[in-house]
Swiss-Prot record:
Region called Tail (penton base attachment), residue ranges: 1-44
Protein name according to UniProt: Fiber protein
Principal cellular location given in the protein's record: virion
Function: Forms spikes that protrude from each vertex of the icosahedral capsid. Interacts with host coxsackievirus and adenovirus receptor CXADR located at the cell tight junctions to provide virion initial attachment to target cell. The fiber protein binds to CXADR with a higher affinity than CXADR binds to itself, thereby blocking the cell-cell adhesion function of CXADR dimers and leading to local disruption of the tight junction. Fiber protein present on neo-synthesized particles may thus disrupt the junctional integrity in order to facilitate further neighboring cells infection.
SUPFAM superfamilies associated with the record: Fibre shaft of virus attachment proteins, Virus attachment protein globular domain
A GO CC annotation given for this chain: viral capsid, fiber
Domain-level remarks: The tail region anchors the fiber to penton base capsomers, whereas the shaft, built from several repeated motifs, allows the knob to protrude from the virion.
Stated induction or repression of this protein's expression: Expressed in the late phase of the viral replicative cycle.
Processing after translation: O-glycosylated; glycans contain N-acetylglucosamine and may play a role in fiber assembly and stabilization.
Positions of region (Spacer): 393-398
Keywords: Capsid protein, Host nucleus, Host-virus interaction, Late protein, Repeat, Viral attachment to host adhesion receptor, Viral attachment to host cell, Virion, Virus entry into host cell
Single biological process term from Gene Ontology: symbiont entry into host cell
Length: 581
């Protein structure tokens, strides 16, 4: 029977071999080989071992490849010729290398660690030391934090001293003393002399009458009797009535008018002057005037018109001014005064002791430069040539800000003064009625050239409504109306003409209600529409542009190139907006 060559992938070393496609050979034989693990048929028909490095066959026997340092001893055991040596703290046993350790080193969870006790601790895988004031760590060194008078000098803790404390040559802290203080007994003491003494460790003062110590304040004072007192810590004589002291502290008799001291004869005498006479007795000398001695020997007074003698409730007589209160006069305390009625008042004095009478004015009135009372005019009111109050005086129109109806070139669209802007703002209560148109006189818009399809103009105002110099409109052509021209003097306030900040907030972004969008016509031709966009308080300003408080911008846009070679001139457009008040 011819055996089939087995497939290498399905090798079965048990004989007889099965064919790849036929049925198994019957009867089955049970050879001593039952597993292909470790065996192979190589060459074909020969059973051999399947080997891998370092196993080989040598002289028909299984052998082991050995590299440098390996050999077999006489008993056939595999040995190593390289002997490992160690040094402390490493220790070699029969089959291991160990690390010899002692405290504070220990092995925890198969890792070498350091056992630490306070103040040492392990934090962040680092052995560190806990410290408490005054100990501290500075520049990675343990140090002591000091505060005066303690300090560190030359690496040593030292004490800073100042007089009277000092240190001796033996580095001993001591105190220096000057008389009456002494340290002769080894302690700080005082040298005493009568009447100062010590008792129970306290200083005392020996004293006798009239000196005594008060019970409440323990203060040494002087006991005083009648006629003597203590004034401002000084002992002095008590005086009353006409007795007093002169500038040198001498006691003296104080005298008033009619009396004087005769210092030569040291006597008190009667001293009188006119109209008194004291030759022998005191008399009153009377001259010409209202004073006289009446029949009862009393001093009396003569009086005439405008004066009268008033008898008081106690029957005393008083001379008073006889005035008529019905004629605008009155008494103000003790003075005659004008009884000012409604419409009159006293103004602030312009000079000392003056308080002029003036007219009291209310709303709608004021004083002019000539101190005359005139009506106070508000916006829109003025005087005409006859001096009457009028509304909307064309020669002094404070209700209209404009550029005049036929201005010279006054603004820039692309270049300086390349266009004429006609802008009229008329105040109508809380609304501003406005009219705008523009005419290009030179540049790329006169006529329209190239791809130009828009024109823009921005006017900016400060917080007082005054036109800023960085506007596209020249301030020289912008003022209140005066006839068909403008005022000759620049205005200083026109806030009432500005767009309302609450209705049109000042922002860099345009809001819907801040824009007025409509259509005008080029040269008034209805077949040539131009879109006009008016933006209130919405202009964008860069860092090099003076910020504005209020603003208006005008943009004219058209599509296509149908307007090339046309002069840019728009029809007038009228609009309104809410005014700032």
């Amino acid at each position: 029977m011819k055996r089939a060559r087995p497939s290498e992938d399905t090798f079965n070393p048990v004989y007889p071999y099965d064919t790849e496609t036929g049925p198994p050979t019957v009867p089955f034989l049970t050879p001593p080989f039952v597993s292909p693990n470790g065996f192979q048929e190589s060459p074909p028909g020969v059973l051999s071992l399947r080997l891998s490095e370092p196993l080989v066959t040598s002289n028909g026997m299984l052998a082991l490849k050995m590299g440098n340092g390996l050999s077999l001893d006489e008993a056939g055991n595999l040995t190593s010729q390289n002997v490992t040596t160690v040094s402390p703290p490493l220790k070699k046993t029969k089959s291991n290398i160990n690390l010899e350790i002692s405290a504070p080193l220990t092995v925890t969870s198969e890792a070498l660690t350091v056992a630490a006790a306070a103040p040492l601790m392990v934090a962040g895988n680092t052995l560190t030391m806990q410290s408490q004031a005054p100990l501290t760590v500075h520049d990675s060194k343990l140090s002591i934090a000091t505060q005066g008078p303690l300090t560190v000098s030359e690496g040593k803790l030292a004490l800073q001293t100042s007089g009277p404390l000092t240190t001796t040559d033996s580095s001993t802290l001591t105190i220096t003393a000057s008389p009456p203080l002494t340290t002769a007994t080894g302690s700080l003491g005082i040298d005493l002399k009568e009447p100062i003494y010590t008792q129970n460790g306290k200083l005392g003062l020996k004293y006798g009458a009239p000196l005594h110590v008060t019970d409440d304040l323990n203060t040494l004072t002087v006991a005083t009797g009648p006629g003597v007192t203590i004034n401002n810590t000084s002992l002095q004589t008590k005086v009353t009535g006409a007795l007093g002291f002169d500038s040198q502290g001498n006691m003296q008799l104080n005298v008033a008018g009619g009396l004087r001291i005769d210092s030569q004869n040291r006597r008190l005498i009667l001293d009188v002057s006119y109209p008194f006479d004291a030759q022998n007795q005191l008399n009153l000398r009377l001259g010409q005037g209202p004073l006289f001695i009446n029949s009862a020997h009393n001093l009396d007074i003569n009086y005439n018109k405008g004066l009268y003698l008033f008898t008081a409730s106690n029957n005393s007589k008083k001379l008073e001014v006889n005035l008529s209160t019905a004629k605008g006069l009155m008494f103000d305390a003790t003075a005659i005064a004008i009884n000012a009625g409604d419409g009159l008042e006293f103004g602030s004095p312009n000079a000392p002791n003056t308080n002029p009478l003036k007219t009291k004015i209310g709303h709608g009135l004021e004083f002019d430069s000539n101190k005359a009372m005139v009506p106070k005019l508000g916006t829109g009111l003025s005087f005409d040539s006859t001096g009457a109050i009028t509304v909307g005086n064309k020669n002094n129109d404070k209700l209209t800000l404009w550029t005049t109806p036929a201005p010279s070139p006054n603004c820039r669209l692309n270049a300086e003064k390349d266009a004429k802007l006609t802008l009229v703002l008329t105040k109508c209560g809380s609304q501003i009625l406005a009219t705008v148109s523009v005419l290009a006189v030179k540049g790329s818009l006169a006529p329209i050239s190239g791809t130009v399809q828009s024109a823009h103009l921005i006017i900016r105002f400060d917080e007082n409504g005054v036109l800023l110099n960085n506007s596209f409109l020249d301030p020289e052509y912008w003022n209140f109306r005066n006839g068909d021209l403008t005022e000759g003097t620049a205005y200083t306030n026109a806030v009432g003409f500005m767009p309302n900040l609450s209705a049109y907030p000042k922002s860099h972004g345009k809001t819907a209600k801040s824009n007025i969008v409509s259509q005008v016509y080029l040269n008034g031709d209805k077949t040539k529409p131009v879109t006009l966009t008016i933006t209130l308080n919405g202009t964008q300003e860069t860092g090099d542009t003076t910020p504005s408080a209020y603003s208006m911008s005008f943009s004219w846009d058209w599509s296509g190139h149908n307007y090339i070679n046309e002069i840019f001139a728009t029809s007038s457009y009228t609009f309104s907006y809410i005014a700032q008040e």
